[in-house]
């Protein structure tokens, strides 16, 4: 009887839950370790492109995700200085036909629950909470992790899904994050509190000099997600804390009254100081690799953080299946296709942030270039991003 492969997954966020489910569906026995007291998500809304839905379908949870998501009519970018529309991409049937899937928005808690509920009920998945991994030891035959209470777990492979401040990554690479100087505020408001002229069934981005705002509906349009980003006056370390309305308003003094009216609506904000990492040529080794933000933390400008984690999870499961459980070959294959794609996302996201936050003549040129684009031109420009499918995930894209 063939030996059943055992995997330890560190981290129970979207990437960890998806990886647990992906590996379990390939017959791998999973132990997931989460440092928090319970497995869940913080944050507000996220956007899901067709690539994310292809991954969710591969994991067997696509229909549940669709039931919890809000399907958008379009994606729009407005100039936050003069209030004019710059970009309008239809995301209806023509978009679905072109990319093979929808564009949607969803509460982060809901998409995490969608994946975690399926993983939790899979007989091959076990988990432990309140488990802070502090040490990792690897031999030729297995890998063992130790927590801060002296407990240990041993398996054939280890997957680090423990986010931007990954302990697993630190043990492998020891590199430092790249502090961006950008701060993100997030809040959720009831639809009744949203200005009438901004109750739009779409992600709408208002691009301003050194700042931008985003809003879109959640949970059947009963709530709206608000996100504001600005260049901080200080280079801040990665972190999350409560924010202040006064700080938000101080960075958005020069924008058009229409988007500015949103800033008074939230009763509370959460504040993220952001960072990413320089792409590297290798994430792990023969028995250890990384998924999601542990591998390739990325800013929010292309709304691809969760989508990339879902792609990673599916690709890793497919690689292990194709390589018949040979971890070294599977991890090499996985990294060979995921590192170039996610590096492109990281670098493209940085550039997109610069373009969104353009000022002066650069802002004027941006608007002229983007206003003239047709729908087919927009679709061609994002084909590389949204054209990912689970059936071609082991091919370089």
Swiss-Prot record:
Induction: By 3-hydroxybenzoate and 2,5-dihydroxybenzoate. GO terms for biological process: catabolic process. It catalyses: 3-hydroxybenzoate + NADH + O2 + H(+) = 2,5-dihydroxybenzoate + NAD(+) + H2O. The keyword Membrane does not apply. Optimum pH is 8. NCBIfam families: PRK08163.1. Its cofactor is FAD. Catalyzes the NAD- or NADP-dependent conversion of 3-hydroxybenzoate to gentisate. NAD and NADP function equally well. PANTHER family: GERANYLGERANYL DIPHOSPHATE REDUCTASE (PTHR13789:SF318), MONOOXYGENASE (PTHR13789). Keywords: Aromatic hydrocarbons catabolism, FAD, Flavoprotein, Monooxygenase, NAD, NADP, Oxidoreductase. The lineage of its organism: Bacteria, Pseudomonadati, Pseudomonadota, Gammaproteobacteria, Enterobacterales. This is 3-hydroxybenzoate 6-hydroxylase. It is an enzyme of class 1 (oxidoreductase). It comes from the Bacteria. Inhibited by copper, mercury and iron ions. InterPro entries: FAD-bd, FAD-dep_Monooxygenase_BioMet, FAD/NAD-bd_sf. GO terms for molecular function: 3-hydroxybenzoate 6-monooxygenase activity; FAD binding. Optimum temperature is 25-30 degrees Celsius. Belongs to the 3-hydroxybenzoate 6-hydroxylase family. Its EC number is 1.14.13.24. Monomer.
């Amino acid at each position: 009887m063939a030996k059943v492969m055992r995997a330890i997954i560190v981290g129970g966020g979207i990437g960890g839950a998806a990886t647990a489910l992906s590996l379990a569906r390939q017959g791998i026995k999973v132990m997931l370790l989460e440092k928090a007291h319970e497995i869940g998500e913080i944050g507000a809304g996220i956007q899901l492109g067709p690539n994310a839905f292809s991954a969710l379908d591969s994991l067997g949870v696509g229909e549940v995700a669709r039931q919890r998501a809000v399907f958008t009519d379009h994606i729009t970018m407005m100039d936050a200085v003069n209030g004019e529309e710059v970009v309008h991409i239809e995301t209806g049937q023509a978009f679905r036909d072109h990319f093979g899937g929808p564009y949607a928005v969803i509460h982060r808690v809901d998409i995490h629950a969608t994946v975690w509920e399926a993983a939790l009920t899979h007989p091959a998945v076990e988990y432990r909470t309140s488990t802070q991994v502090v040490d990792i030891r690897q031999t030729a035959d297995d890998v063992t992790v130790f927590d801060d209470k002296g407990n240990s777990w041993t398996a054939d492979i280890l997957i680090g899904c423990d986010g931007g401040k990954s302990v697993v990554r630190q043990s492998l690479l020891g590199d430092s994050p790249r502090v961006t100087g950008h701060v993100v505020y997030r809040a959720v408001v009831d639809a009744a509190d949203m200005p009438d002229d901004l109750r739009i069934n779409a992600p709408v981005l208002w691009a301003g000099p050194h700042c931008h705002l985003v809003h879109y509906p959640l949970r059947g349009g009963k709530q709206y997600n608000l996100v504001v980003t600005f260049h901080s006056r200080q280079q801040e370390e990665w972190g999350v804390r409560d924010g202040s309305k006064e700080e938000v308003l101080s960075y958005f003094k020069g924008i058009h009254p229409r988007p500015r009216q949103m800033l008074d609506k939230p009763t509370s904000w959460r504040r993220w100081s952001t960072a990413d990492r320089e792409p590297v040529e290798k994430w792990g080794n023969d028995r250890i690799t990384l998924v999601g933000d542990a591998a390739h933390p990325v800013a929010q400008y292309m709304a691809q953080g969760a989508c990339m984690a879902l792609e990673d999870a599916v690709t890793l499961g497919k690689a292990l299946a194709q390589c018949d459980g040979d971890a070294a070959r599977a991890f090499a294959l996985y990294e060979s296709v995921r590192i170039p794609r996610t590096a492109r996302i990281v670098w493209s996201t940085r550039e997109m942030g610069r373009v969104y936050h353009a000022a002066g003549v650069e802002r004027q040129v941006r608007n002229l270039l983007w206003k003239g684009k047709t729908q087919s031109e927009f679709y061609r420009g994002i084909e590389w991003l949204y054209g990912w499918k689970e059936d071609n995930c082991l091919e370089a894209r």
